[in-house]
Regions:
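Short pre-functional
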Residues: 1-7, 129-130
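Short, basic (Lys/Arg/His-rich) helix/loop patches that form interaction surfaces
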Residues: 102-143, 147-150, 159
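Short helix/loop segment immediately N-terminal to the Walker
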Residues: 66-81, 115-117
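Conserved tyrosine-mediated DNA breakage-rejoining catalytic core shared by Y-recombinases
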Residues: 11-57, 67-72
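C-terminal secondary-structure termini that scaffold catalytic or DNA-interacting sites
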Residues: 46, 164, 170-178
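C-terminal catalytic core of Y-nucleophile DNA break-rejoin enzymes
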Residues: 37-61, 81-104
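Catalytic-site neighborhood detector that most strongly recognizes the C-terminal catalytic loop/helix
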Residues: 145-171
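Aromatic/pi-system hotspot detector in well-structured domains
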Residues: 58-69, 81-86, 105-108, 132, ...
């Protein structure tokens, strides 16, 4: 739902997911070089990604689960604790690593779960494509994805709008008769 890069997501701390409390919830992407899992924000650019109510509720449920696991294990959880953590294997509640995510994806793919050839980055591309197909301006998509320049977004996703326009032209007869 966010279009974040894997490294951005893995570097999040609990306090960087800000609940809306009557306003729009958001994730604050903070560049840092001290993540215990080595996760990094590309080009070290901070940004804010607004999220919907469904993801906000999912976060609240996830945080409750993490807090319960932490309490059972005697592990302290604070705003500066990693957001995405190990829950199935040691070290318990340690920052999730990229290799762990990629291993899980490989397992899911071997089981035939998900589209053929999908990767974590596939979700970022899908997010951007869906936004553009919904009519979101390119500059908004560019900022949401953290691209340094809108031209990067156009280079990667310009075909989406082109294809959409070409599909619309399939109904040329209705345009010609009006």
């Amino acid at each position: 739902e966010t279009g974040m890069r894997l490294g951005e997501a893995l570097g999040l701390r609990i306090g960087e997911f800000v609940l809306g409390r009557g306003d729009t919830a958001y994730v604050q992407i903070v560049p840092r070089s001290d993540n215990p899992n080595g996760a990094r924000v590309k080009m070290m650019r901070p940004r804010r990604v607004y999220v919907g109510a469904d993801l906000e509720r999912l976060f609240a449920d996830y945080l409750t689960d993490i807090a319960c696991r932490a309490a059972e294990s005697g592990i302290a959880v604070t705003d500066t604790s990693p957001l995405l953590v190990n829950v199935a294997r040691p070290p318990l509640l340690a920052a999730l690593r990229e290799t762990t995510v990629r291993e899980k994806v490989a397992t899911l793919r071997r089981r035939g779960i998900g589209p053929l050839g999908w990767t974590p980055h596939w979700f970022r591309h899908t997010h951007a494509t869906a936004l553009l197909l919904a009519g979101t301006p390119e500059w908004v998509v560019s900022r949401r994805l953290g691209h340094a320049h809108v031209q990067t977004t156009l280079d990667l996703y310009g075909w989406v709008r082109d294809d959409e326009a070409l599909r619309a032209a399939a109904n040329w007869a209705s345009y010609a008769s009006s």
